[in-house]
Curated annotation (Swiss-Prot):
Cellular compartments per GO CC: plasma membrane
Keywords of the record: Cell inner membrane, Cell membrane, Membrane, Transferase, Transmembrane, Transmembrane helix
PANTHER family on file: PHOSPHATIDYLGLYCEROL--PROLIPOPROTEIN DIACYLGLYCERYL TRANSFERASE, PROLIPOPROTEIN DIACYLGLYCERYL TRANSFERASE
Record-given protein name: Phosphatidylglycerol--prolipoprotein diacylglyceryl transferase
Family the UniProt entry places it in: Belongs to the Lgt family.
Amino acid sequence: MEHIFLELRSPGPDLFQLGPFSLRWYGLLIAISVLVGLNLSSELASKKGLKKSLINDLLPILVLASVIGARIYYVAFEWRNYTGKNFWSSINFLNLNIPLPSALEIWGGGIAIHGALIMGTLSIIFFCRWRKEPFWDVIDVLVPSVALGQAIGRWGNFFNNEAFGIPTNLPWKLFIPYRFRPEIFSTQDYFHPTFLYESVWNIFVFGILIFLFRKSNKKELKLPPGSLSCLYLITYSLGRFWIEGLRTDPLCLGGVPPFCEGGLRIAQLISLFLISAGLLGIWRIYVSKKALPDPSSINGRNQ
């Protein structure tokens, strides 16, 4: 039996176009993620007893660092697609073709969450050292927003017809136009909607984090600083490891695309590292009964 009514099909990357200007779904979803994250993190920070202005002051630095990190990370592992004849591209502005390095065309897609996490974390360390804020308290109020923002942002992959999985005929199958399919699957029409899997998984992660935060805020549960951050690393990375195994466009360390034959899937490797880091953090907090070292403090101790 065909379940055509459940078929997913992207309407395209552009929400609307006005003359030379266009609004892309990808950019809109990122903007929505930022706004939702700002409001949620500000509310959680206030309940945590942090300064009300903290999130507003941190957000511009965090967003800029995260976007830059996400793009650099992606381009670094896909460098072959941005060299030689592919190095230059152009944008049309008022009927003028302006040359631009293709690596800067972030609006066309091609960002990686792990790059955003790395640069975003570094920016928080810098900010907390500068403002003398407690690093783990700050990052604990941010991770629920990160999970929710990822759930929203993943839909940008849907509109761009990217980051999809291997062929499938499941009821929730995703139709991919011919020009976006890997050559090996050129005759296949339907694929796993891995963007949807990750979006749903991130909502699940968000639910766990916000539930525990509220329990802690009501004094019904004791959560030492860093607990939510470690839990985020573990839960998000578990889902990402599985979902990455379905994708046809993984970033590879060596190997042959689209399945990194003879090489490694970078996201799975990073996920294993993050799971290990999260478990070590939980062990230190709850078994060794020691506070996590504060990376924003010069001596590594909590401020």
